[in-house]
Amino acid sequence: MGLSPVNIFKPFGLGRAKAVIAAVSGGSDSLGLLFLLKDYLSTLESPPVLIAVTVDHKLRAESALEAENVGLLCQKHGIMHCVLSWDDPKPAHGLAAAARTARYRLLVQAARDAGAGFIVTGHTENDQIETFLMRKARSGHCEARGLAAMSPRSLLEGSVELARPLLTVSRQALRDELTRRGIAWVDDPSNANIDYERPRVRLGVAAEADGQEVLEQIAQAGAARERNNAALVEALADPATLGVDAAGMMFLNADCYAALSPGARQLFSGLLASIAGGRRFLPGDGERRRIERMLSGQDAPRRLTVFGALIERGEKGAPHRFRRERRNLPKLDLVPGQHIVWDGRFCFFNSGGRSFEIAPPGRQELIDFLKNSGRDIESRRCEALLISPALYEGGKLAFVPFLPGAEWPQGVHIERHFAIFDHVLPGHDFALAQAVEARLGRACAEIS
């Protein structure tokens, strides 16, 4: 008896989508996914359109032909198919990570173009075990958040859900399913290239590991992650726990912080460092422990710079402070019709007809701007503006947001951006992200 498409896919609610993107490389995992998904969608009264998307990474001479063969197979079975190519220059280092980033960028764009609410991938139980072993080797200890491995659901770019419905299905079960259906697959030779981390783990430690034991460790790590997340969600429900000013400086109540467990404290302060620095990831385990020790008074320094964030310990009941350090702040062009993220902290939309440059103001030009506009801002507020975006027009400082009653160009809108959540949000962290956004908000207020 084969695998049950209904049991596999029903929990994901795919039926509410207009279209579903299936990521299909031509390997056994993705082809198994495709045909099981096709069978499931055929059971729905009003099924979404199924679109198979093959990403040609242009890393092997055979890849174009393999993508073409996937298209022929899809045509034979009445499945829409398209090929997207990664045509960018390939990096000398970190190729696998760069390819993964490019792949998801292309898949998200395909989903948006098709109005698809879901991207579905063929990650299997074997991949889950390998992911755990890879992350455990990197972290060196058993309490790392990443040991919860891959979430069955994630949200990409705030708009498209990534579903991994096969995380409890083995690769062999999928191959047996394809064999039963008479469908052949391609074995990508890069999957056996031990120059890459995953094949090295797959052919080494994963081949020798007790799979059931690893899955139990994943469940334990997931439970620990949920406990720390839940502690932060509960703390954030109290408005006194965390505050933020217009420019994004955050104020963490020292007593609330001290009342948390060490693991929850490390998560909380690491998360705020990532938000303040505009980063997509948490600081490493060691850095999070270092921040927690400093804020808890176990280490002497009263301030640290981590991940682009300046963190200051509050004394005598004062709140701990997190803000962007004044280094490596970008300059970006904002043209009509554009939507861009500045420094991982602010999102700009330009529906007007004028072009601007977004950059932090220089100290003297900010002083002159404030003087010419008749404003008197205290020193601490002025420092906040120096790490905030301003608009330049024709090379001249033209608009400074967050000032009371400040003029602002027609059609330009700014809101807060959370890089750590807004690009890839694992399902493990859905509730935590909602709690952070509810407390900090997206709207940008004024500095008075």
UniProtKB/Swiss-Prot annotation:
The keyword Ribonucleoprotein does not apply. One of its GO terms (molecular function) is ATP binding. One of its GO terms (cellular component) is cytoplasm. It catalyses: cytidine(34) in tRNA(Ile2) + L-lysine + ATP = lysidine(34) in tRNA(Ile2) + AMP + diphosphate + H(+). The keyword Manganese does not apply. It is found in: Cytoplasm. Its EC number is 6.3.4.19. ATP binds at S25, G26, G27, S28, D29, S30. It is an enzyme of class 6 (ligase). GO terms for biological process: tRNA modification. Keywords: ATP-binding, Cytoplasm, Ligase, Nucleotide-binding, tRNA processing. The N-terminal region contains the highly conserved SGGXDS motif, predicted to be a P-loop motif involved in ATP binding. Belongs to the tRNA(Ile)-lysidine synthase family. Ligates lysine onto the cytidine present at position 34 of the AUA codon-specific tRNA(Ile) that contains the anticodon CAU, in an ATP-dependent manner. Cytidine is converted to lysidine, thus changing the amino acid specificity of the tRNA from methionine to isoleucine. NCBIfam families: lysidine_TilS_N. This is tRNA(Ile)-lysidine synthase. It comes from Brucella melitensis biotype 2 (strain ATCC 23457).
